[in-house]
Curated annotation (Swiss-Prot):
It comes from the Archaea. There is a cross-link at H235-Y239 (1'-histidyl-3'-tyrosine (His-Tyr)). Cu cation binds at H235, Y239, H284, H285. GO terms for cellular component: plasma membrane. Its EC number is 1.10.3.-. This is Quinol oxidase subunit 1. CDD domains: Heme_Cu_Oxidase_I. It comes from Sulfolobus acidocaldarius (strain ATCC 33909 / DSM 639 / JCM 8929 / NBRC 15157 / NCIMB 11770). Fe(II)-heme a binds at H65, H374. Heme a3 binds at H372. It is a multi-pass membrane protein.
Length: 517
């Protein structure tokens, strides 16, 4: 198969693994967009004497960063991880053409929406998100009601197409599942949270469609109802990637620990706890809104229930590692899974105080919150997704395994990425605890050192991720260049770690037996 044919097979996929690669490449593109936007907005934050004139550029970079992350990267990455979980469970994506159509159309439409340079924050609260006057423009380039309505309309359609992609994944998973067999733990989490995504993502489509009707049909927007509708999507979306990655950790960590999962029953029951919990705690994003006491108490209880599910995941995986004889951290996939788990513990611990009504005022709308969820992104999501990506590389080429040298450099890259970004996250959290508010371009000079440290550490850490990804890809492509075609393995890369000399002896002995016969 020529290089052009291979590219065509990803651009317009005809098999499960090609669909996975298509969505993976899409997610990496949006990761680049959100990363560039982040470094641009951080450039402004390193200066403590910003003119009000730079506010528009700062908030536009902030909004594009958020939209590219939450509305583009997250659904793409979730679909890639879930699709790969099906592949690893010997299930198939049947409707490859439809998945390609959903991918290309949704990305083009999201690009059109972002081309207007949105300037209102990723959660686009009313009334700012629907204003365009001498005081404020929700979009820097789309300043007329028609253009603003068009932007929200194409976003609605894009989100509907994304929802259709997850519905397709669910349908294809059950259509190809052998009767009487249950899904392995990776696919079980993938399918379960495809359902969560398919249920909650339409809330974003409805919210943006409401804005469209405001511009084209003069339908009034109720601020509180709109916010409630948005957060029914807005809270679960932060788990669209982490929860399928939980399935990946349940799948990989036992392999590299050399034993079965400590309790698969816990892992499977935990799906219900996490799935239901994530759709019931959205109100904790509305702590400063005039909510009744009963609802506030529900926020506390439901969030603790959700935290229990996360804690059970940590306990299950931790016991799997600690009761094993030896964990194979020298394999980059094993190393990535371990870093993801440790990062999730450290990032998750910070979140326990946030939903508590009596404590939240100390942290609400501060950089403490930013530090918490970015730690989760930089460790569990980025490192967890990198772990899956590396296994995708090995799975895509029959017989391929990373060399000892490339494995070493990928481990170095993972630590190189993780250590500085842990520092960034904790610097953000300390600044937030001291009173640094999020989304503010003008700030007291006392916080400038924190912003300088955060930007400096981020610049140090980024090459680590690039090193990990490029070394892995170079090693895989160097191997593939010696192969006539891309092919799917019949045996997992983990089980192929066999001494070559012993393998040759076995083959020779079998030939001898055949000759005697």
């Amino acid at each position: 198969m020529s290089l052009i044919e291979r590219i065509k097979n990803v651009v317009w996929p005809k098999d499960t693994l090609s669909v996975v690669w298509l969505y993976t490449i899409g997610s990496i593109f949006w990761l680049g967009v959100l990363g560039i936007a982040a470094m641009n907005l951080r450039t402004f934050l390193t200066y403590d004497q910003n003119s009000p004139n730079v506010g528009e550029l700062y908030y536009s970079a902030l909004t594009i960063h958020g939209w590219a992350a939450m509305i583009a990267f997250v659904p793409m990455a979730a679909a890639a991880v879930i699709g790969f979980s099906l592949y690893k469970s010997k299930l198939s994506i049947i409707h490859t053409k439809q998945m390609a159509i959903f991918f290309w159309l949704s990305n083009v439409l999201l690009g059109i929406a972002m081309a207007g340079s949105p300037d209102m924050g990723w959660y686009m609260y009313p009334p700012l998100a629907i204003e365009s006057n001498s005081q404020f423009h929700a979009f820097l380039f789309y300043t007329t009601p028609q253009l603003m309505g068009m932007a929200y309309l194409v976003m609605s359609i894009a989100v509907i197409l994304q929802t259709a992609a997850f519905v397709t994944l669910i349908a294809d998973a059950y259509a190809t599942k052998p009767k009487g067999e249950r899904l392995n733990i990776f696919a079980a989490y993938g399918v379960a949270f495809s359902i969560v995504i398919a249920v909650t993502l339409p809330a974003l489509a409805a919210a943006t469609l409401w804005y469209t009707l405001y511009f084209f049909a003069n339908v009034p927007v109720n601020n509180l109802l709109w916010a409630i509708l948005f957060w029914f999507y807005g809270h679960p979306v932060v788990y669209y990637v982490p929860f399928p990655l939980f399935g990946a950790l349940y799948y990989y960590i036992p392999q590299y620990a050399g034993r079965s999962l400590y309790s698969e029953k816990w892992a499977r029951w935990n799906i219900y706890l996490l799935a239901i919990g994530t759709m019931g705690v959205w109100v904790h994003h509305l702590q400063t809104w005039p909510l009744p006491i009963v609802l506030r108490e529900w926020v506390n209880l439901s969030t603790l229930i959700l935290a229990t599910g996360s804690g059970l995941t940590v306990l299950n995986l931790g016991l799997t590692i600690f009761t094993s004889r030896k964990y194979d951290w020298k394999d980059p996939v094993g190393m990535g899974a371990l870093i993801s788990l440790i990062g999730f513990i450290l990032a998750g611990a910070q979140a326990l105080v946030l939903p508590e009504n009596s404590i939240n005022p100390l942290f609400h709308n501060s950089y403490y919150v930013v530090g918490h969820f970015h730690l989760m992104i930089w460790t569990l999501i980025i490192m967890g997704y990198t772990t899956v990506f590396l296994d995708m590389l090995r799975t895509s080429f029959a017989g391929f395994n990373f060399s000892a040298t490339s494995s070493k450099w990928m481990r170095i890259g993972m630590i190189w990425w993780t250590a500085p970004f842990m520092g960034v996250g904790y610097a953000m959290s300390v600044a937030g605890y001291l009173g640094f508010l999020r989304r503010m371009i003008a700030y007291p000079v006392i916080f400038q050192p924190y912003n300088l440290v955060e930007s400096f550490l981020a610049e140090i850490g980024i090459p680590g991720l690039l090193l990990t990804l490029f070394v892995g890809m170079f090693d895989a492509l160097a191997y593939a260049s010696k192969q006539p075609v891309f092919s799917s393995p019949s045996v997992s890369s983990f089980s192929m770690q066999v001494d070559k000399g012993e393998l040759v002896k076995k083959i020779d002995s079998e030939k001898g037996v055949n000759n005697v016969g």
